[in-house]
Regions:
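Short glycine/proline-enriched turns and hinge-like loops at secondary-structure junctions
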Residues: 49-51, 58-59, 99-102
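Double-stranded beta-helix
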Residues: 9-11, 16-17, 73, 96-128
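Short acidic-glycine-tyrosine-enriched beta hairpin
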Residues: 70-92
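Short beta-strand His + acidic residue motifs that chelate non-heme Fe in jelly-roll/DSBH
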Residues: 46-48, 66-68, 87-89, 94-100, ...
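A short, N-terminal "cap"/entry segment at the start of jelly-roll beta-barrel domains
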Residues: 1-35, 44-46, 78-79, 121-128
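Glycine- and acidic-residue-biased ligand/ion/polar-headgroup-sensing regions
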Residues: 52-71
Length: 128
């Protein structure tokens, strides 16, 4: 019987600078994507949605105002989220995060990330 050996070597994540902070991409392949989103206090990314991406967030540090649009009623909502909270975003769900604390961090697990799969509804720090 042949023995299977896996050689998992440590590596550095891929850092992507943003006006609101930065993303640290841990992995992005055809099965899944894992990222850390680290925010500057008072900054937010755009209100946007994805048609392909299904994402789940874990607030690992700090506090945010989480904003989303109910697409059936066209109503915008917002709520306070903090360390330990989780959010699941289905494809097509417009969403936005505003950091209330410096270094506020989200651990994101999702289906594969594609740059062309972000549709902006309102600008964020990177668009102004």
């Amino acid at each position: 019987m042949r023995e299977l050996t896996l050689q998992a070597q440590p590596y550095q994540g891929e850092r992507h600078e943003k006006a609101w902070g930065h993303e640290l991409w841990i992995i992005n392949n055809n099965l899944y994507c894992g990222k850390l989103l680290v925010f500057k206090k008072g900054k937010q990314f755009s209100m946007h949605f994805h048609l392909l991406k299904d994402e789940a967030w874990y607030i690992s540090k700090g506090e945010f105002t989480y904003k989303w649009i109910d697409t059936e009623t066209a109503t915008e909502h917002e709520t306070h989220v903090k360390e330990g909270d989780c959010i699941h975003l289905m494809p097509g769900q417009p969403h936005q995060m505003l950091a209330l604390t410096e270094g506020a961090t989200i651990f994101e697990v999702s289906t594969q990330h594609f740059d062309y799969d972000s549709y902006r509804v309102k600008p964020g720090a990177s668009q102004v």
